[in-house]
Amino acid sequence: MNKRSLIAGVLSVCLMLAMLPAAFAVEQGEANITPQTTMKELRENPSIKGSGYYTYCREMLPIESLYWQNKTLAQYAKPELVEDCAQAMNLVIENYNNGVQVTWQIYTPEEIEANPSLGGAQLFYYPASTPGGKYALVVPGNGNGVTSEMEEGGSAAYQLHEMGYTVFVLRYRSFLAASDNAPLQDLGRAVQLITENADKFQVQSENYALVCFSAGGQLGGLFANREIGYGNYPVPKPGVLLLSYPFVDFTYGKLAYHVLIDPGTREWRYYTTI
């Protein structure tokens, strides 16, 4: 091989190496979500998809996605929440584009392998602009069917983030996956995950706030009780408890819940307390 051929070969290798980062670069979306963005456009945003943020707040069945995909965010979310909801999704996009891990599994891979329903329990992370402060954990409602991580969760997260807090939004098991006190267990494990990784999340582990809505409000109220809540994990007790229109009366649902999700059990369940 002559000198010229050797130089050409070296240059070719260098050129290929220089192109590798571009070839393997993660596709990023633009933070351009508005109330007029359709749900299909929102869900196909590369950064929303890549982040793993769960946006199916109204679809009980997969086929319902076909109905909602061409509806706008303004049609999907409540009018009083839609602006903050859009900004929350833009914040998710910005965080993802900046290398932030948005979605965190609450349970270990081994636990999820043994019980796949645990894979649906997740935290969505909104880091504060200034690290080292207190955090808020948002527990959205679920209509006893599907949870509202994007609508109630996202809109509350955006407002709290603007106040300077690090915010986590909890996706917990619901409806037929809610047996054996699953939603309460998910909340406990979520706080445990944050507490054990406080340095990684750059938050203070104590005096956190629980910001809860509807059925999530019921879970937050139970979790604030040491005997049946936070003391079982163990984690620090909440410093602040904000319950917005909490669901507090299972009088007409206890029998249905027992039959559907906990048939035959006589042990305490989260929906039998009130």
PLM segments and residue spans:
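N-terminal targeting or regulatory segments adjacent to alpha/beta-hydrolase or S9 domains
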Residues: N2-G9, P21-P116
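Hydrophobic core
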Residues: L11, L15-M19
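A short loop-to-beta-strand scaffold at the N-terminal edge of the catalytic core in hydrolase folds
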Residues: N115-P127, K134-Y135
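Short beta-strand element of the alpha/beta-hydrolase
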Residues: G133-N142
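Catalytic nucleophile-loop/oxyanion-hole region of alpha/beta-hydrolase
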Residues: S148-E152, L170-S205
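Short amphipathic alpha-helix adjacent to the substrate-entry channel of hydrolases
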Residues: M150-F168
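Primarily recognizes the serine-hydrolase "nucleophile elbow" in alpha/beta-hydrolase
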Residues: R189-L260
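Serine-hydrolase catalytic core
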Residues: P263-I274
